[in-house]
Amino acid sequence: MKWSILLLVGCAAAIDVPRQPYAPTGSGKKRLTFNETVVKRAISPSAISVEWISTSEDGDYVYQDQDGSLKIQSIVTNHTQTLVPADKVPEDAYSYWIHPNLSSVLWATNYTKQYRHSYFADYFIQDVQSMKLRPLAPDQSGDIQYAQWTPTGDAIAFVRDNNVFVWTNASTSQITNDGGPDLFNGVPDWIYEEEILGDRFALWFSPDGAYLAFLRFNETGVPTFTVPYYMDNEEIAPPYPRELELRYPKVSQTNPTVELNLLELRTGERTPVPIDAFDAKELIIGEVAWLTGKHDVVAVKAFNRVQDRQKVVAVDVASLRSKTISERDGTDGWLDNLLSMAYIGPIGESKEEYYIDISDQSGWAHLWLFPVAGGEPIALTKGEWEVTNILSIDKPRQLVYFLSTKHHSTERHLYSVSWKTKEITPLVDDTVPAVWSASFSSQGGYYILSYRGPDVPYQDLYAINSTAPLRTITSNAAVLNALKEYTLPNITYFELALPSGETLNVMQRLPVKFSPKKKYPVLFTPYGGPGAQEVSKAWQALDFKAYIASDPELEYITWTVDNRGTGYKGRAFRCQVASRLGELEAADQVFAAQQAAKLPYVDAQHIAIWGWSYGGYLTGKVIETDSGAFSLGVQTAPVSDWRFYDSMYTERYMKTLESNAAGYNASAIRKVAGYKNVRGGVLIQHGTGDDNVHFQNAAALVDTLVGAGVTPEKLQVQWFTDSDHGIRYHGGNVFLYRQLSKRLYEEKKRKEKGEAHQWSKKSVL
């Protein structure tokens, strides 16, 4: 389901203001303020996301209007009809899903967040003719975890109390009855949601709606981590904190086991399907996909525990026989779970059926056609660039639409490739630096082309066989007008050459009214994790980084550097960090800082570094080098020791503790000399309710530093009560950025040999 609150009626015929291949710098005199960038986020481009629907006319979609009503609109003609009036929408509606024939709406209400993607809710089915609402479960109490229509609309599968149910014409069948705290049916446990599936469901209907494949997770034996909540959303703290008992497997600990099940909806028969690609205790199922137009074949992408070996196992539904149809060895690094398998069918005159997937088996991530029956794959794209997303598959035209880095790793352009001729066609001018995306209609005849930067984003509507837009969908004219009042930091992009000959992508933000004759402090803002990317030519939000480059009392240059190990520059570039996280990443950030220090407009004595999550870890590893290149470090929600993080993420890059003990020891932040010597000190921030990167990381790091004699003038610590990894509880986010602003101001004003308090010069007796 996609929310949209913007009407498309009356949109411009085409984009009024041409965009430039660089970020805007404004044409006014106003400077961005803290309140505008951090508190209110006042200047933000908008975009619509539509839920395309299949009707007699291609280009129809459903959206929720500003008054709350559900409407169907033709993106081609702008004709609009009301599906559900505003006064018939259920109270406290959070989300909705439309019946395939538009006869009913499935509503989620009474929303309660769980983890990153998951939530609990009540669900109601609304008949569009009578507008009557029926509860999906009569006794529901905000406890349903997931619900989904079949592709044909004959039934709804839903998950409650970790059990799978099927609703058909007001009759409900319970499919599993063993769900509980340690057994999950149809929904992932915490680690599969966070690290593998990246979503809140683990069930998939066959294309014809006859079968349901779902995963069953068994957490028996998985160690428990306790997260305390001191306030627990109360105004006055309870005498005893609420404790969340979370099954959280850390490095080399027991992982949940996973099992594939098939349900035939007509008979209600459920069958477990063994996947023997790897030992059951080692098996990770990364993806489930139906490789058929009906219900003949379902496939799973299976990995070993450390995710450097992969097998695609196809299951014949009729016989339940399984066969490995594709296999990869990635022991030179790791294998990413890209969730990109999709059925194509026969190609050309051949009756052999194929599916498409993204694979970096050539050293670069590209599109490949794999035979469903097994055999040699066919490369659709190739070269020293990478495919990042499959957007649409047009079977009648035999085309795949995709995004790639063909022009540059910091850019995304839209292309199609024919699986008949292998001809690649750009749908945008790929010689102009930009980031694009697109959303295709249900029959593939139209698409919304989204320009995402570096200039102010906009969206145009195209017909698939036209090179000119039909009209503009979103112009963001209000943002363009607002920017006329401001003068903005100047964002530039370049590459730094390492001694090895490799290059690092850099995004530099120069302060407002920059003068090359002045010297400015610098803030490095890395993330730096495996496969990640921060340096992108997408629109850069007018956020905290824009603020510190605008405030006349701060005027910081910011550098964002994508170190070795980050994504979209080929397998060799990213896999160098395997089994030694923190080493090359820190070396690259130090190298970049040393290069920055040589610039005539950089104050080499005031170069700071701040990172969040993996960026917080990387900041710590940089400080640990004791290079002298950085004068201040800020670590927000950092990992400090990979033994403390979850197994499925960590072992993908570090292998097991038993096989790589030396690597784990080297990757932990334990050397204190850099913390003692960093001239402006270090600030460590962490939420006590972080269920992802546990507060344990900061607690252990601070104990190491204090125990080793790091002084109070060098170390400041700030915890955020009950905040999770995003640090937003009870105003924590604004406090965090105010504190960071204060530290950056103090660092800018810090004198190299300033006087200190007398008690800091001698031992305290």
Swiss-Prot record:
Leader peptide range in chain numbering: 1-14
Keyword flag Ribosomal protein: no
Alphabetical keyword list: Aminopeptidase, Glycoprotein, Hydrolase, Protease, Secreted, Serine protease, Signal, Virulence
Enzyme Commission code(s) on record: 3.4.14.5
InterPro entries named among the record's database cross-references: AB_hydrolase_fold, Peptidase_S9_cat, Peptidase_S9B_N, Serine_Prot_S9B/DPPIV
MF (Gene Ontology): aminopeptidase activity; dipeptidyl-peptidase activity; peptidase activity; serine-type peptidase activity
The keyword Ribonucleoprotein is assigned to this record: no
GO biological process: proteolysis
PANTHER family xref list: DIPEPTIDYL PEPTIDASE 4-RELATED, PROTEASE FAMILY S9B,C DIPEPTIDYL-PEPTIDASE IV-RELATED
General function of this protein: Extracellular dipeptidyl-peptidase which removes N-terminal dipeptides sequentially from polypeptides having unsubstituted N-termini provided that the penultimate residue is proline. Contributes to pathogenicity.
Protein name (record): Probable dipeptidyl peptidase 4
